[in-house]
Amino acid sequence: MAKTRPGVAFSSKIKLGKKDIKILGREILLGNVIVEVGFFTVGDCVLMRPSDAGKAPYVARVEKIEADARNNVKVHCRWYYCPEESHGGRRQLHGAKELFLSDHFDVQSAHTIEGKCIVHTFKNYTRLENVGVEDYYCIFDYKAATGAFTPDRVAVYYKCEMPYNSDELMELLLCHYRVHLACVGVTIEEAKKLEHFVCVECSSDEDGVKRFQNGFASSTTNDLKPSAEKMIDVRASYEL
């Protein structure tokens, strides 16, 4: 992993030299510098344009904004890593919009920022009615040098015994566990057409089978129930 992620500049207006001006509208106060970038400030999560036009934008959190001796506006940022950039690469347990907050800090030109995004807590992410292209979520902090994650243990869930991610789930009607559609061989289209799903263990109850023999049901992601409160070592699942 390179120490920096070079970006490509885009045409942003920059004003320099004004003093003691408060944040007003699109203007951001940087000591004696006003940067008229219009859409980001310290603490925001932003998309940074990569040098390779074929790659998706990098995601970073703005830690500090300042101008150097030549009045070039610089952004101190903390990178988010996508699963593909971690030591173990992307695995089945990773959500499509999952990011890791790394300990990789960097300095980039303000010109490389092409827009804002939102990195939600996982709980808030699962409550979104509509997930936009700008929406991501983060559960783990990630040490770029060692590949270690914090926290290092997470709950696992029924059937696949994998950490929960944001992919499509359905609920088992009798025991109320949640399972990934892919783990039970059901597509999203099939799940929408059917009403209930009964797991193998619950189907041994004859009354249950008679009452709930019609198939599957789609499910929301609230009130998840771990698999017998099992926990797994994140190092085994995320780092290998």
UniProtKB/Swiss-Prot annotation:
Keyword terms: Chromatin regulator, Metal-binding, Nucleus, Transcription, Transcription regulation, Zinc, Zinc-finger
Major localisation: nucleus
Biological role stated in the UniProt entry: Chromatin remodeling factor that binds to methylated histone (e.g. H3K4me2/3) to prevent their acetylation (e.g. H3K9K14Ac), likely by recruiting histone deacetylase (HDAC) complexes, and thus regulate the transcription of target genes.
Pfam family, one: BAH
Similarity section: Belongs to the SHL1/EBS protein family.
Phylogenetic classification of the source organism: Eukaryota, Viridiplantae, Streptophyta, Embryophyta, Tracheophyta
Highest taxon listed in the record's lineage: Eukaryota
The keyword Transcription regulation is annotated on this UniProt entry: yes
Cell compartment(s), UniProt: Nucleus
Zn finger spans (PHD-type): 155-205
Subunit structure: Recognizes di- and trimethylated histone H3 at lysine 4.
Residues annotated as domain BAH: 38-153
GO cellular component, one term: nucleus
GO MF annotation, one: transcription cis-regulatory region binding
Residue stretches spanning the membrane: none
Protein known as: Chromatin remodeling protein At4g04260
Keyword Membrane set for record: no
A GO BP annotation: negative regulation of gene expression, epigenetic
